[in-house]
Amino acid sequence: TWDGTEYSIAEWNADQNLNSAMINSVNWYFENLDRQSGIADFLTKINYGNCDLSGGLTSWMQSTLKISPVEQIDTLKAFYINEYGFKDENVKAVKEAIEISDGFYGKTGTGKVKGHEINGWFIGFAEDCDNVYFYALNIQGEDNASGSKAAEIAVEILSDRGIINYEN
């Protein structure tokens, strides 16, 4: 539930559910989930990157928690087949929340420092009749290294390879 705090992103200034929070990257929603779920134990359970939350929960996106693209893919594959033993309906809900188009799933992430987008992620998977293709793209720079830019690059690569047929 939104606590009334005014954020610079209008979509954040309302109650959220998983789908709306995923679509609008509502950080406060996920920070609340992290607090409620005991995120440190959870990260250890799924072996997520270096599992280091010493930088705090509100700044973990650009802080001490680090993960490589290969580790992201390993985590995503394990999630996809539910190696972690989550409730099936929860796995399904997350997959539905990150579905971009039929058979194409992904989530962006952007790390900002002093208002500059310095770390962009786009991770996900694409399904066809015979295969599942997992991907994780990370771009870094002094500015304009956003999740949306990472998504543009990933879509171009996946399209060029004939894995997806997607137009934004």
State where each predicted segment sits.
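Active-site SXXK
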Residues: 1, 21, 135
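Acidic/His-rich structured neighborhood in mature extracellular/periplasmic domains
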Residues: 25
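A generic structural signal for nonpolar/aromatic side chains embedded in well-ordered alpha-helices
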Residues: 21, 43, 94-98
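Tryptophan-centric aromatic hotspots in well-structured domains and transmembrane helices
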Residues: 1-2, 60, 121, 125
